[in-house]
Curated annotation (Swiss-Prot):
InterPro entries to which the protein is assigned, alphabetical: Defensin_beta-like (IPR001855), Sperm_Ag_11A_B (IPR007988)
Subcellular location: Secreted
Cystine bridges: C30-C59, C37-C52, C42-C60
Function: Has antimicrobial activity against E.coli. Plays a role in the defense response in the male reproductive tract, contributing to sperm maturation, storage and protection.
Keywords linked to the UniProt accession: Antibiotic, Antimicrobial, Defensin, Disulfide bond, Secreted, Signal
Any one of the GO CC terms: extracellular space
Organism per entry: Rattus norvegicus (Rat)
Tissue specificity as recorded in UniProt: Only expressed in epididymis (middle part of the caput).
GO biological process per UniProt: antibacterial humoral response; antifungal humoral response; negative regulation of interleukin-1 alpha production; negative regulation of interleukin-1 beta production
The keyword Manganese belongs to this UniProt entry's keyword annotation: no
Entry-linked PANTHER family: SPERM-ASSOCIATED ANTIGEN 11A, SPERM-ASSOCIATED ANTIGEN 11A-RELATED-RELATED
Protein encoded by which gene: Spag11a
Name used for this protein in its record: Sperm-associated antigen 11A
Signal peptide annotation: 1-19
Amino acid sequence: MKVLLLFAVFFCLVQRNSGDIPPGIRNTVCFMQRGHCRLFMCRSGERKGDICSDPWNRCCVSSSIKNR
């Protein structure tokens, strides 16, 4: 029973301390870069950027937009 309790506490702590960026902010940053959050892979003509807020999603930015 103690093991189950410790596992539950550990699981909650890991989820709450998942990073320094609040949920949803990564999606906003992607949209500000004129990108789209896509699951796993980007379409042709797009390059991969940072991760989005949702698990497994990547920010895909058009390759025609030049780096600033």
